[in-house]
Amino acid sequence: KTGVEYGDYTLNHVEGCSHGCKYPCYAFLMKKRFGKVKDYSEWLEPCIVENTLDLLGKELPKYRNKINILHLCFTTDPFMYKRPDIQTLSLEVLRRANAANVRCSVLTKGILPTELAELPLRNEYGITVVSLSEAFREEYEPGAAPIQDRINSLQELSNQGCYTWVSIEPFPTPNIHEQNLLELLQRIHFVDKIIFGRLHYNKAVSQFNGYQEFYNECARKVIHFCEQNNISYHIKEKTLIEK
């Protein structure tokens, strides 16, 4: 059971992540704080939890009637870019969960495989996109998949009738990266849901004059766009703060 505000149950079957996000990455900060990893370089060498499928076989019968949706993943990436071993395991986890009549959601900065469209349940397939800029991606998500490749894989699943969503989080302030939010929204117009959230744990955010009003304005743009295009949405806590 996860404490993440839009989550239900979660499965994290890998320790670490080779995407090496530098926003900074909240999962890395927590793992380092509690002594699970020594440093950034260790975090970049992900390790599969070897008994994942055995644990899944034991846990699914216990929890399947309680689970509304099982999320992969909040502290790692289920379709880690250029890691076919992790991708294969994630697909098998999804197949077994669906076989137990448990719906799943996934969130990745990798490439969503087309095989996901063959799964029997109405799963929810998502990608993170906080900018359309490859230069920004290379600086802040150095090991992740190129932005357009992510979006194309999501659009292919959408074209095949799958439920798709995008997480625009953590969205940077203009002093970190200046961009056109509407352009980003229009590029992902085909999705069923958008989640929008501010950037935390980066002091540059508070150095931007009027940062809260900036996030308020961005959140309102997301809400307006979603309502105009019949897209469901969720604005993360502490992103939109009305006076």
Describe each PLM feature range:
Residues Y6, P146, C162-T164, C218-A219, ...:
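Generic detector of bulky aromatic hydrophobic side chains
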